[in-house]
Amino acid sequence: MRYLPLTDADRSAMLARIGAASIDDLFVDVPEAARLAGPIAGLPAHASELAVERHMSRLARRNLSAGEAPFFLGCGAYRHHVPASVDHLIQRGEFLTSYTPYQPEIAQGTLQALFEFQTQVARLFGCDVANASMYDGSTACWEAITMARRVTKRDKAILSAGLHPHYVSLAKTMARFTGDRLDAAIPDLTPGAPGDDMARLLAAIDGETSCVVVQNPNILGHVADLSELAARCHEKGALLVAVVTEPVALGAIRSPGEMGADIVVGEGQSIGVGLNFGGPYVGLFACAEKHVRQMPGRLAGVTADADGQRGFVLTLSTREQHIRREKATSNICTNAGLCALAFSVHLTLLGETGLRRLAELNHAGAVAAAERLAQVPGVELVNGAFFNEFTLKLPREARPVVRSLADKGILGGVSLGRLYPGEAALAGGLVVAVTETASAEDVETLAQALEAEIAA
């Protein structure tokens, strides 16, 4: 029995202090008929804490957790090994707080951590400046579209067929209220370059286009060179928005900024942040310095105080929600700061060499897995260039295959039929992600199980 420091004597003293005879006197403004009198019919008495823990543990055992099975799920959320030191550092009392650092004189540590995070994101994305993070990748993507509208004074955004369908769905929802025109498409399983609609994008850019949004690697794992697309956007006065849902890939491929992207956004979950049942995650946002005043979110900057000492502050705040709503660049009024810190700590522990090595491990494992799975009779590998994720074309609908594999304790990938319901041409698509957490034995287990499923 836990000790609760509120005795009958304490309660009586408190009531006497405020001049109330009983607890009921505190609710005299609530009509008698609306007050709860006695227990609720049909609702059992509360259980003890121990009983609740046992009940929740029984429920949890019904789940198939990522660490208990060969795991090949991806499509925007990836399982990577996160060193224990990351959680240890972010749980320090100085960081584990919901406090927003509006008062720099008492928040120098938090502000410096955000400044370092921004520096890392800007370098990773090949951009001049980054903000202190957004909610997640999908909201960062939408904010990039609205930023492009402000910069170009145009309202037509062209979305690549390889953009994550959840990102597209969010953009369509928001565009209903903003009036933005979205030109979207669904991917195909063209062998060699699945989901790559570069020809469509190049042809669609015109004088009304505010931006082109392209994901790299895309939803099907295809990796593309964005240089030609960036040049065409700039020729027509539009911006190129690049989306990165797997930042580990940037340890192996050229950054979007190097390829000419004006705005780069993404999901930072795969570095430092666990799967977490889908959230909270950390949205990444970076851009060219000439557009910084139109960039949403908070910015931590460095300055000097009256004594010449270096200090960190929230800067360019007139872009944000501190001013009139209709004038603000964004009305997102917070961010997943702790997740941003986890991202920064993990990336710091890796360093440039470590990130490159991690990327090499992922790519090598994915190549080996793709070669093995393509040997399964009836299975076709549709990717040419990919990083740690690729798409298989099965001879039957992939969704029931995925469910059957899960019943056997194998999380074998993401069915495109789940992401694109009703699209028969994509029903046989299976997206497989291979990170450093997947062993050769895991791949062989998946290959044998997949072969048995297809032969059944």
Swiss-Prot record:
Gene Ontology molecular-function annotations: glycine dehydrogenase (decarboxylating) activity
Keyword annotations of the record: Oxidoreductase
InterPro entries named among the record's database cross-references: GcvPA (IPR023010), GDC-P_N (IPR049315), GDC_P (IPR020581), PyrdxlP-dep_Trfase (IPR015424), PyrdxlP-dep_Trfase_major (IPR015421), PyrdxlP-dep_Trfase_small (IPR015422)
Reactions it catalyzes: N(6)-[(R)-lipoyl]-L-lysyl-[glycine-cleavage complex H protein] + glycine + H(+) = N(6)-[(R)-S(8)-aminomethyldihydrolipoyl]-L-lysyl-[glycine-cleavage complex H protein] + CO2
Keyword Oxidoreductase: yes
A single BP term in Gene Ontology: glycine decarboxylation via glycine cleavage system
Domain of life, source organism: Bacteria
PANTHER family assigned to the protein according to its UniProt record, in alphabetical order: GLYCINE CLEAVAGE SYSTEM P-PROTEIN (PTHR42806), GLYCINE DEHYDROGENASE (DECARBOXYLATING) (PTHR42806:SF1)
Cited NCBIfam families: PRK00451.1
Subunit structure of this chain's protein: The glycine cleavage system is composed of four proteins: P, T, L and H. In this organism, the P 'protein' is a heterodimer of two subunits.
Job of this protein: The glycine cleavage system catalyzes the degradation of glycine. The P protein binds the alpha-amino group of glycine through its pyridoxal phosphate cofactor; CO(2) is released and the remaining methylamine moiety is then transferred to the lipoamide cofactor of the H protein.
Family: Belongs to the GcvP family. N-terminal subunit subfamily.
Protein name: Probable glycine dehydrogenase (decarboxylating) subunit 1
Lineage: Bacteria, Pseudomonadati, Pseudomonadota, Alphaproteobacteria, Sphingomonadales
Primary gene name: gcvPA
